[in-house]
Amino acid sequence: MSIYEPPKTGKMSLIHQTLFDLRNDGVQFAVSFVDMLNVRTLSDFLIKFGTAVMKSAASTPDAYAAIARKHLADTHFVFDHVRFMTCDELISLNWDPDMNDVEKMLRLPQAIAQEKQMPYYIIFKEFQNLMKAEEYDDVFKLMERMMRDRDRSESCPVVYVMSGAMVNAMKLIFEEKRYFYRQVNHVALMPVDEKLIIEHVVKGFLNGMGKSFDRNLAMGACELFKCNLWYVNHLASICDALSKGFVTEMMMTDALSSMISVHEPRFVSIVNDLTDHQLSLLRAVLDGVVKFSASEVIEKYRLNSSANVRRVKDALKKKEVITFNEKDEPVILDPLFEYWVSNVYFEIR
């Protein structure tokens, strides 16, 4: 399973809720969360993976060492007591890893699932970072082979959930390069219904704080943030701090200004990293352009040529500023950045 959406859109909330529901239904399973935020090399990945898996299977140094001896024999993996005490690292490498090391490590969850006689869920966070390792192609192909060859009737399967916040990098893996083709189902998060968000905000203020939050103001927040619940909650929390009995439009404007002041350094860093052509194409997106290679668009926004347009689009995708939907229409990934770059940077009124 793959889940790729921008940051703070509910990926991990969905995963945690699903696991909670399974446990609530009496389903027994093991789970490991492999946080790949700082993975840059194959060694980083293998150590992160092994540490997460072993933590879910044991709880003492002797047990960790036993897992390494039993399941990772004839590899470069060792349980290093010093590394464990100083870095909380349950598995270490005594040499550069080879593909035998990779395969043995990737098979570790299945071995543990068989021992425990229960399904095993591996949750990858920021899965796209594995592409920073030079050997990513070999690793992906090995994972594909393992998924293809596994016994579908197995009572204790290993299930991989590959999540990531870099939308275009994840699309590159699953849609463009087509790794794990027909092996992984993509779960797209649907926007939370606007009516539910409005009800959540209005009732939350009334029942929780005894305050009034006008439905029209809540609707405006939903439209501004495109129903991004994290941003709506952020705005609502500031409105709560500013208000005593009821939230006014002026308070909401002040709350939005406070949010902008918090996020503006990040937004300034984004635009400072863009070239003139990239900024021009971003302006075209804000103006509602969808056909960037049209001659009048190239001339109006000084984009030089169709070939240059393709390069600029790819650059903005790589920088995770925009993505393109199934209709090949541009979408700015961060709704608050979209508001800021439109109203503050380009001063579009």
Task: Give residue spans per PLM region.
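P-loop NTPase nucleotide-binding core
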Residues: 5-9, 13-121, 130-131, 136, ...
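Alpha-helical DNA-recognition elements
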Residues: 21, 238, 315-318
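C-terminal leucine-rich, beta-strand-based interaction scaffolds used for sensing/assembly
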Residues: 261-349
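Sensor-1/coupling segment of RecA-like P-loop NTPase cores
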Residues: 114-123, 129-135, 139-177, 189
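Short, conserved phosphate/pyrophosphate- and ester-handling motifs at nucleotide-, phospho-/glycolipid
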Residues: 12, 228, 334
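Amphipathic alpha-helical "lid/sensor" segments that cap RecA-like P-loop NTPase cores
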Residues: 197-265
